[in-house]
């Protein structure tokens, strides 16, 4: 049997919308924008729940994972969160970490991918402790259940270090720390992305129209020059007999 260690007192240490199972299970599951957390929980996950924002949401996931050294796998499943792109942001944090000063997740494509409440040692612990399993955009209950059970069978045992507890501040208690980064809803972020896309398309159409207008002007000029040239040649041909006489 794999070696186990105690999780932090009162684990999970951060509140959230999740189902808690056996704290000695090696598997944590985030269902991203989907609400089918009952499936991985029933399959034996230690904790399972949605994660909809690429800042506070990810901070909570990381805090609850590193405070339980028994968790060695994090399965990302369910629908990706539009606008926030939370699943990809978690992958980027695990692979690339974050800027040590700005705390922006390196390589994340979400709207506001900042993990200000996670110290660098917490980020490194997250990277070292768990293996990510990518089932993003997969809501199939059978596939999720099978993957949870597969990870349980591969349990390497508890992480070598004890539980790490960090505080995740949900309020804005430190206004002097700098400009607050306010989470936005997935719908708002998606709307902004679509507006930017429309603006780009409008600019592209304008460029095409200008190009077509330039081509049209060039064609008109060519026709006029050809017409004038034809008239001049015709005039000279008509005048040739008279000049010869």
Curated annotation (Swiss-Prot):
Annotated compartments: Cell membrane
Free-text comment on the cofactor: Binds 1 5-hydroxybenzimidazolylcobamide group.
Q: Which GO terms describe its cellular component?
A: plasma membrane
Q: Which GO terms describe its molecular function?
A: cobalt ion binding; tetrahydromethanopterin S-methyltransferase activity
UniProt lineage: Archaea, Methanobacteriati, Methanobacteriota, Methanomada group, Methanobacteria
Quaternary state and interactors: The complex is composed of 8 subunits; MtrA, MtrB, MtrC, MtrD, MtrE, MtrF, MtrG and MtrH.
Task: Summarize where 5-hydroxybenzimidazolylcob(I)amide binds, as residue positions.
Answer: 84
Classification via HAMAP family: MtrA (MF_01093)
Cofactor(s) demanded: 5-hydroxybenzimidazolylcob(I)amide
Asked if the Swiss-Prot or TrEMBL record annotates the protein with the keyword Cell membrane, the reply is yes
InterPro entries reported for this sequence: MeTrfase_MtrA/MtxA (IPR030688), MtrA (IPR005778)
EC supergroup of this enzyme: translocase
Protein encoded by which gene: mtrA1
Give any Pfam family that matches.
MtrA
Record topological domains on the Extracellular side:
244-245
Which protein family is named in the record? Belongs to the MtrA family.
Please indicate the ranges of residues that lie on the Cytoplasmic side.
1-222
- Residue stretches spanning the membrane: 223-243
Q: What is this protein called?
A: Tetrahydromethanopterin S-methyltransferase subunit A 1
Q: What is its main location?
A: membrane
Domain of life of the organism encoding this protein: Archaea
């Amino acid at each position: 049997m794999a070696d186990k260690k105690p999780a932090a007192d009162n684990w999970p240490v951060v509140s959230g919308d999740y189902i808690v199972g056996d704290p000695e299970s090696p598997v944590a599951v985030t269902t991203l924008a989907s609400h089918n957390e009952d499936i991985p929980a029933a399959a034996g996950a230690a904790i399972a729940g949605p994660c909809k924002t690429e800042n506070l949401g990810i901070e909570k996931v990381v805090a609850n994972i590193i405070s339980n050294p028994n968790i060695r796998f994090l399965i990302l499943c369910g629908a990706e969160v539009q606008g926030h792109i939370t699943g990809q942001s978690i992958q980027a944090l695990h692979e690339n970490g974050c800027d040590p000063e700005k705390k922006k997740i390196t390589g994340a494509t979400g709207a506001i991918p900042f993990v200000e409440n996670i110290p660098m040692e917490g980020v490194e612990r997250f990277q070292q402790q768990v293996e990510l399993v990518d089932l993003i955009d997969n809501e199939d209950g059978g596939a999720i259940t099978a993957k949870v059970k597969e990870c349980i069978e591969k349990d390497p045992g508890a992480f070598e270090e004890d539980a790490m507890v960090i505080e995740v501040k949900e309020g804005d208690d430190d206004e002097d720390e700098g400009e607050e980064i306010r989470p936005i809803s997935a719908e708002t972020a998606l709307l902004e992305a679509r507006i930017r896309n429309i603006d780009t398309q409008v600019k592209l159409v304008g460029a095409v129209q200008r190009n077509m207008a330039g081509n049209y002007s060039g064609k008109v000029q060519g026709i006029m020059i050809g017409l004038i040239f034809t008239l001049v040649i015709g005039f000279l041909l008509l005048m040739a007999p008279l000049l010869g006489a």
